[in-house]
């Protein structure tokens, strides 16, 4: 996934996740709030859409195929989503809300000394895991963003900006201690988050070039640690 971080736009991912859980956000296409069975049907349709995205181009996906996979009818699908793209948009929104775990890792991690390097490793692992888990949806987000769809573009900005802002706060905290001088915190954090996201998106491609993911992981973590703290990373054991 090619990544563009846009620091000017800030979004609270935690707040997004909370709002995503509200029943009124699960309204059917006719405006009604579905009951328990309706919510279960809607969730099953989303799960089937996500599963089909792993093996099928989203442009080739048809409502009838998703409905059949979910054990229901196209008419039922249209009760909840206007079209396939609308269902994928919901999956993308849920994916962005799940990005709060990346924000939490940055905010709660200890960035000093060897503990800081462990935090950088954990953040790198979390990015790799996040991209592997959400890769089918992220592909659609990326393609739709390139094509100018602002809905998907805003989701991508929301996901990456939240991490960037939190990491910039860590850089600024080191600067307040007289360390990591000479860099603008948001620019530094944006560069590091872009590296994390792009490498996470393409680490499987490195394997085809004979570059092990384990080695890529260490390389990225060392860059993140050095860029955040301005301290030399510890020598790998």
Give residue ranges: language-model regions.
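An amphipathic alpha-helix signature
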Residues: 46, 121, 125, 161-172, ...
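Helix-turn-helix
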Residues: 44, 52-86, 90
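Hydrophobic/aromatic-rich alpha-helical bundle segments in the mid-to-C-terminal region
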Residues: 139-142, 153, 175-222, 231-237
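Alpha-helical DNA-contacting segments of helix-turn-helix folds
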Residues: 53, 87-95, 141, 163
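Generic hydrophobic, amphipathic alpha-helix propensity
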Residues: 37-49, 66, 91-103, 167
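N-terminal intrinsically disordered/low-complexity leader segments
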Residues: 1-40, 182, 232-237
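Short secondary-structure transition hinges
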Residues: 136-165
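Hydrophobic alpha-helical connector segments
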Residues: 86, 90, 104-133, 185-192, ...
């Amino acid at each position: 996934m090619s990544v563009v971080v846009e620091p000017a736009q800030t979004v609270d991912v935690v707040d997004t996740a909370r709002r995503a859980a509200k029943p009124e956000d699960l309204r059917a296409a006719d405006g009604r709030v579905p009951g328990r069975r309706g919510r279960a049907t809607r969730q099953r349709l989303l799960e089937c859409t996500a599963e089909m995205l792993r093996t099928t181009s989203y442009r080739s996906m048809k409502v009838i195929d998703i409905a059949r996979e979910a054990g229901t009818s196209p008419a039922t699908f249209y009760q909840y989503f206007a079209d396939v793209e609308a269902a994928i948009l919901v999956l993308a929104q849920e994916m962005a809300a799940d990005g709060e775990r990346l924000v939490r890792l940055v905010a709660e991690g200890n960035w000093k000394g060897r503990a800081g390097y462990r935090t950088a490793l954990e953040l790198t692992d979390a990015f790799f895991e996040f991209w592997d888990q959400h890769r089918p949806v992220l592909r659609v987000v990326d393609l739709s963003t390139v094509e100018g769809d602002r809905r998907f573009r805003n989701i991508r900005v929301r996901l990456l900006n939240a991490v960037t802002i939190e990491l910039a706060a860590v850089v600024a905290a080191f600067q307040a201690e007289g360390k990591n001088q000479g860099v603008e915190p948001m620019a530094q954090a944006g560069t590091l988050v872009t590296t994390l996201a792009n490498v996470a998106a393409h680490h499987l491609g490195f394997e085809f070039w004979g570059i092990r993911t384990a080695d890529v992981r260490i390389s990225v973590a060392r860059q993140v640690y050095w860029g955040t703290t301005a301290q030399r990373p510890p020598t790998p054991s």
